[in-house]
Amino acid sequence: MPEDRAKAYTEAGVDINAGNALVSRIKSMVASTHTKGVISDIGGFGGLFKPDLGGMEDPVLVSSTDGVGTKLKLAFMFDKHDTVGIDLVAMSVNDVLVQGAKPLFFLDYFATGKLDVEAAAQVVSGVAEGCRQAQCALLGGETAEMPDMYAPGEYDLAGFCVGIADNARIVDGSDIRVGDVIIGLGASGVHSNGYTLVRKLFEKSGLGADDIMPGTDASVRDVLMTPTRIYVETIRNLMRDFQIKGMVHVTGGGFYDNIPRVLPASVDARIAFGAWDILPVFHWLRDLGELSWPEMLQIFNCGIGYVVIVGQEEADDVLGRLAALDQPAWAIGTVERRREESEEQVYVDFG
């Protein structure tokens, strides 16, 4: 665009040419995510997607929106922007997956005060990587440059996912029964929740970004910025051969707030603490914050990022399949009859 046509807007703080430069940088990234349903290119007013409804008697669209939260503050602090895009995708696609939906497409929203093309391109590269992992298309997005709205060098992200499921195969927890087995799938790290506390504890620790995280051989930066695991391929594999009765994406509120969201009112979940491997980062956070394990399980995933609930007769086979898929997983609990005297539905045995 000729400079004189955008001069006044640039002087006001919005650089249209920078926005165009970003679009040029990310075109190939976006194209790398396209699936056969995409029938439009980047730059249109809306993204076009033609879903394949073959084999679905009663298709239902499933949608979700989410952000990355204050994990972004660490991205700014560490000047590391290439993984938060994966987090952004994971937070939405894992949510639609809980209902048994296959993610179809994703859209992102990037808002900042002054557009840093390099940082934004790194973010979008992560979004594209997340979409490839989730086997969904990055169909479009919005970049908003809003002077005076954000501190220099900072931005915010939001993501939107649409998936599809056959109505008869929607997973809603209604088939969960007493005796079913609760299987926890390992997390990659802290994922994207609890980072307001994580940041405070990191500052308290006195460690630098390049220092080694206690109990690991990785830097504090790499451990804290490890992206949220995307479970789409693994769960889609399980759903082909097993009856998955309920699923949980373990996000804000941990076990106590998320597992009850899929349980019928007639049952409780009993969790055996110690049945799974707790990652070193959670021991580090607990020690720094002088937190109890019940507090930790209310705030963080503590090493379990996703839960599936299956019948007892299928539990061993499901665990075997997960091992074959290189997905760490453990039988972490069972479904029991509801305790009528209590409002709680999750009980953790700390032994």
Curated annotation (Swiss-Prot):
GO terms for molecular function: ATP binding; phosphoribosylamine-glycine ligase activity; phosphoribosylformylglycinamidine cyclo-ligase activity. It comes from the Bacteria. It is an enzyme of class 6 (ligase). Keywords: ATP-binding, Cytoplasm, Ligase, Nucleotide-binding, Purine biosynthesis. CDD domains: PurM (cd02196). InterPro entries: PurM-like_C_dom, PurM-like_C_sf, PurM-like_N, PurM-like_N_sf, PurM_cligase. Pathway: Purine metabolism; IMP biosynthesis via de novo pathway; 5-amino-1-(5-phospho-D-ribosyl)imidazole from N(2)-formyl-N(1)-(5-phospho-D-ribosyl)glycinamide: step 2/2. Disulfide bonds: none annotated. The keyword ATP-binding applies. It catalyses: 2-formamido-N(1)-(5-O-phospho-beta-D-ribosyl)acetamidine + ATP = 5-amino-1-(5-phospho-beta-D-ribosyl)imidazole + ADP + phosphate + H(+). SUPFAM superfamilies: PurM C-terminal domain-like, PurM N-terminal domain-like. One of its GO terms (biological process) is adenine biosynthetic process. It holds the Pfam family AIRS_C. It is found in: Cytoplasm. Its EC number is 6.3.3.1. One of its GO terms (cellular component) is cytosol. Belongs to the AIR synthase family. This is Phosphoribosylformylglycinamidine cyclo-ligase. The lineage of its organism: Bacteria, Pseudomonadati, Thermodesulfobacteriota, Desulfovibrionia, Desulfovibrionales. The gene is purM.
